[in-house]
A protein has these predicted regions:
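Residues on the lipid-exposed face of transmembrane beta-strands in outer-membrane beta-barrel proteins
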Residues: 239, 251, 329-335, 368-372, ...
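A conserved hydrophobic secondary-structure block that centers on an alpha-helix together
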Residues: 470-472
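Extended, hydrophobic alpha-helical segments in both membrane/secreted and soluble proteins
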Residues: 366, 597-603, 611-619, 632-641, ...
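Transmembrane beta-strand segments that form the barrel wall of outer-membrane beta-barrel proteins
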Residues: 347-348, 613-622, 665
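Short, small/polar-rich motifs associated with maturation and membrane association
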Residues: 7-368, 373, 379-382, 461, ...
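Surface-exposed loop/interface segments of Gram-negative outer-membrane beta-barrel transport/assembly proteins
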Residues: 244-310, 352-359, 367-459, 477-597, ...
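Short glycine/threonine-rich loop-to-helix capping motif typified by GTGT followed
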Residues: 627-631
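Conserved small/polar residues in nucleotide/adenosyl-binding loops
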Residues: 1-8, 762-766
């Protein structure tokens, strides 16, 4: 027993010693943890690595937190941080640095960021270093577009690109923007050419969150590689691609309200009545007896007038706090051989005039981009595909003389918006008690009643490509792109009466139409880059073929069946009109098919990235012109000099980081006219043609001319053809410079250009 007791006692002591040792160790580790979590006041100086001068305004931030500061006039900073945290030092034009906190003093030297000049910009059928570009271009990054929270990329581009003017045509949700590059250069369509990932497309249907960058080719030298389509400039949109790494999921959304920034100040009832009385007095007549106009008063339950009706029609037409919202979900990632990027987007914008029921725009977007390298990168294949679906409803935009708001400016404030029964019509259509506004209309009622229309557009765009690089720097590429769109429009006009001049008492009407459009482009290029000592060359040759076709089908009906004369039932099948005279009509036809074939090339040279020369040439053939006039030639030449790289500029390098002067000349073309204007199509019609004998209404054949008798079928040219139609051309000469100053904090771009348009294409007045 004694031995057993001794062993138990020794075991107890051993365990106790182990427990005490473990406790002491735990306390030490805990104290170390507390020490490591101590907050330090970190100070230091930030200087330039090139000259040792202190940098003012450097951002110093604790990574992953909101804590931050900036350096003072001497480059000094002070910030609180914990040991082990990371400080991020950021400065415009300098490479960002991250340093882990290990003590109270951290001095940092930042180096200049050469990537600013080594950035690439998208040019025709390729990319190029920004400092080697010899034409006039402008770029906006996708991150800057996303910050704008707009429904259209064009809205985000407003005011961001010099030489590019973007204006809204009406401000209605989903309404297109008017874009001009370096002013109007033609009497016809002045819109630039839009290329989405190298293929023609509609920029208005792109989700802004999908955009990597937008580059605008402004001068003819930059755009001449696109020849016949580039007379009004070129807008190149590059969408986001996948990157090597683990799958990355992003989501962003916003929800906001929009209201008119300023509305027209209208006269209230008292001011309006005062002005009317002054008008009468100035004309020598007695002022109005306002008490005699029963229709302009509000009445109490006893039928006694209490106050004058006082309607602000502008305020009524507008809707405050119209909702706008957008949501985007993206997934991207990939491996060393395959990358992908997918996105889903939804945008909805309510109109500030009328509200959602009469002015609204909704869009759904889907996009997938992928790239795959095969055989150690010798072959690369991929695709960019997108689908968009748009639903919209809109009020009549019109012009400054005829639009939905015009009536609100003219309308008296003494008229009510609604009648006693809550409808828009009375008292405007009740002349027995509307003596003051017997000839007035209800602009709000007209807008809410007549805006029965819906437009739906589905668009699918895709291009697939294959690229082979059999030897280094020789790339042979083929791309096939398709743009298909299908649209459906429906409108309905009910019966209404707001005044003698604002009414429809005859028939209900419905209209439906459908459009289908198919645009196909096939592009083949071969490019090669090579160097000989300090001389760098790049060459590109290619051909492109394009084909467009489409169909249209439309119909209209009238006199909708009773019980089916409201918007939900307003379809062609519910109309009862039996003839064209009653409102029945239908038409369908194939759209004019067009084709274009192009051959192009480019040769570029630079010496030590100091002197640059580029040549381009394109030949376009278009079915819009007659034989002998179908082909046009569009050359360009441009040169640049990075003068800041010269030794004699050494003294300026303390403040001048980069200076390039450039000059260019080029010719571009325009074929934006209706197809086959060189032909004189023959049209047949049942009209008054009297040649020889013809059958009269009495069943007897007659000769000569008699207006009493019926008509006969005849044929005639619907227009005069112009067989000599040829290309409209635009020549531009450009001189400019690009500069970056003060550690790339200030960028200056200057251009002087002369633009001459020759052989204008326009339709003669009929």
């Amino acid at each position: 027993l004694g031995d057993v007791y001794k062993r138990q006692l020794m075991e107890h002591c051993r365990k106790s010693r182990f427990f005490r040792a473990a406790l002491v160790t735990l306390c030490l580790l805990t104290s170390v943890g507390f020490i490591s979590a101590d907050t330090l006041t970190v100070t230091g100086t930030v200087t330039s690595a090139s000259d040792g001068e202190p940098l003012i305004g450097v951002t110093v931030q604790v990574k992953g937190t909101a804590a931050g500061t900036s350096t003072d006039i001497d480059g000094n900073y002070s910030i609180k941080a914990e040991t082990g945290q990371t400080l991020v030092f950021s400065y415009v034009g300098m490479t960002q640095r991250e340093i882990t906190v290990t003590g109270p003093r951290i001095d940092v030297a930042l180096t200049e960021n050469s990537e600013v000049l080594d950035e690439v910009v998208v040019i025709g059928y390729g990319v190029q270093k920004k400092k080697l570009v010899t034409g006039a271009t402008a770029q906006i990054k996708g991150d800057d577009i996303a910050k704008m929270n707009t429904t259209s990329p064009l809205q985000a581009m407003q005011g961001q690109l010099p030489g590019v003017n973007i204006a809204s045509s009406s401000g209605q949700p989903g309404e297109g923007m008017k874009v001009t590059v370096r002013g109007l250069g033609t009497t016809g369509n002045s819109s630039p050419l839009y290329l989405i990932d190298g293929m023609p497309g509609d920029i208005n249907t792109i989700n802004p969150a999908d955009i990597e960058s937008i580059d605008v080719l402004k001068d003819a030298a930059s755009a001449a590689i696109y020849g016949a389509q580039a007379a009004n400039g070129v807008v190149l949109v590059t969408t986001k691609q996948g990157k090597e790494g683990r799958a990355k999921v992003t989501f962003d959304g916003y929800f906001g309200w929009q209201s008119a920034a300023k509305k027209m100040d209208m006269l209230n009832a008292y001011e309006y009545m005062t002005i009317q009385d002054e008008s009468m007095l100035n004309s020598g007549a007695a002022p109005y007896d306002w008490g005699s106009f029963k229709s302009i008063w509000n009445y109490n339950a006893d039928g006694q007038p209490t106050s004058v009706i006082d309607t602000d029609w502008i305020d009524t037409m507008f809707k405050d706090n119209a909702i706008t919202q957008s949501y985007n979900l993206g997934v991207s990632g990939g491996s060393a051989t395959s990358t992908y990027a997918l996105s889903l987007g939804y945008i909805d914008q309510e109109g500030i005039v009328g509200g959602k029921d009469v002015s609204n725009y909704s869009r759904y977007n889907f996009r997938i981009n992928s790239d795959h390298k095969l055989f150690d990168g010798i072959i690369t294949v991929g695709e960019q595909a997108s689908f968009s679906y748009v639903k919209s409803v809109g009020i009549g935009v019109g012009n400054q003389y005829n639009n939905s708001l015009r009536g609100a400016f003219d309308m008296t404030p003494l008229a009510p918006v609604y009648s006693d029964n809550g409808k828009f019509g009375s008292p405007f259509n009740d002349t027995s008690d509307s003596d003051w506004y017997a000839n007035e209309g209800n602009p709000y009622g007209a807008m809410m009643t007549n805006t029965n229309n819906r437009n739906k557009v589905a668009r699918f765009s895709a291009n697939v490509y294959a690229q082979v690089e059999p030897i280094k720097n020789l790339r042979i590429r083929t791309v096939y792109g398709v743009n298909y769109s299908s649209s459906e429009y429906r409108s309905f006009t009910p019966l209404y009466q707001f005044s003698p001049y604002s009414q429809n008492l005859s028939q209900t009407r419905v209209s439906q139409n459908m459009n289908h459009d198919l645009d196909m482009t096939w592009t083949n290029t071969a490019s090669y880059d090579w160097t000989i000592k300090d001389h760098a060359f790049n060459a590109l040759i290619g051909m492109e073929a394009n084909r467009y076709s489409g169909t249209y089908l439309g119909a209209n009906q009238a006199y909708l069946k009773e019980g089916f004369d409201t918007w939900p039932y307003a379809w062609i099948s519910n109309g009862t009109a039996a003839s064209a005279g009653d409102g029945l009509g239908a038409s369908g036809y194939p759209k004019d098919e067009t084709r274009r074939v192009s051959y192009f090339g480019r040769l570029g040279w630079n010496w030590a990235e100091k002197y640059m020369i580029n040549f381009t040439l394109r030949c376009d053939g278009s079915s819009n012109f007659a034989r002998g006039h179908r082909f046009g030639w569009f050359p360009s030449v441009s040169a640049g000099w990075n003068i800041s790289s010269e030794s004699f500029m050494e003294a300026t390098r303390g403040w001048l980081d980069f200076l390039k002067i450039r000059a260019s000349w080029g010719r571009v073309g325009n074929q934006n006219i209706s197809p086959y204007q060189f032909l004189a199509p023959i049209k047949t019609q049942n009209t008054h043609y009297f040649f020889g004998q013809y059958l009269g209404p009495n069943g007897v054949y007659n000769t000569g001319y008699d207006t009493v008798l019926g008509t006969n079928w005849g044929a005639y040219p619907s227009r005069l053809g112009n067989y000599d139609l040829s290309w409209e051309t635009s020549e531009q000469t450009d001189f400019g410079f690009d500069a970056r100053l003060f550690n790339n904090r200030l960028a200056v771009n200057f251009d002087f250009y002369m633009k001459n348009t020759n052989c204008l294409l326009y339709t003669s007045p009929s």
